């Protein structure tokens, strides 16, 4: 029971770090990056589908992204979805492909994006701490019910604390890396 609780908690913490990694990747830096389009979806035959599954996305230059839809009729919906997203870019459609020029970030916009990155990192750390709290409650219940000895539960709690620290450190590293990317001119 203890091993299951620890395994389940670690799995959830890993997922929280993965979500944080995806969230941080969706924040645009001053450079072109295909990952910035991961969160943009369009309605494709009644299903909300990411544009990354409906087109090829290439970065021919540092500040230019070229999006080529697999189906020509998806050109307009993809262009509209990008324009309406929170990326702050203006796509141009030449009939076959969509070109997205990535404008230089202003100092104020960089600071806002750093705040946004820190906020997403803090959300992930709160999620990890909540997972830890629930696992600790489960370990206390196991101890109370007599399903495991006190030494085993104490050892499991220390392992859980170690895992919590490890995953929160990973989130801190991700945020620090993103902050460096954003502040780099």
From Swiss-Prot:
Gene3D superfamilies associated with the record: 3.30.1360.40, Ribosome-recycling factor
Domain of life assignment: Bacteria
UniProt keyword annotations, A-Z: Cytoplasm, Protein biosynthesis
Renumbered residue ranges of the record's region Disordered: 142-173
Bias type Basic and acidic residues, positions: 142-164
Main location: cytoplasm
Subcellular compartments: Cytoplasm
Pfam family, one: RRF
SUPFAM superfamilies: Ribosome recycling factor, RRF
Biological process (GO), any one: translational termination
GO molecular function: ribosomal large subunit binding
GO cellular component term of the entry, any: cytoplasm
Protein family (similarity comment): Belongs to the RRF family.
Entry-linked NCBIfam families: frr (TIGR00496)
Function of the protein: Responsible for the release of ribosomes from messenger RNA at the termination of protein biosynthesis. May increase the efficiency of translation by recycling ribosomes from one round of translation to another.
Name of the featured protein: Ribosome-recycling factor
Native source species: Mycolicibacterium gilvum (strain PYR-GCK)
Gene: frr
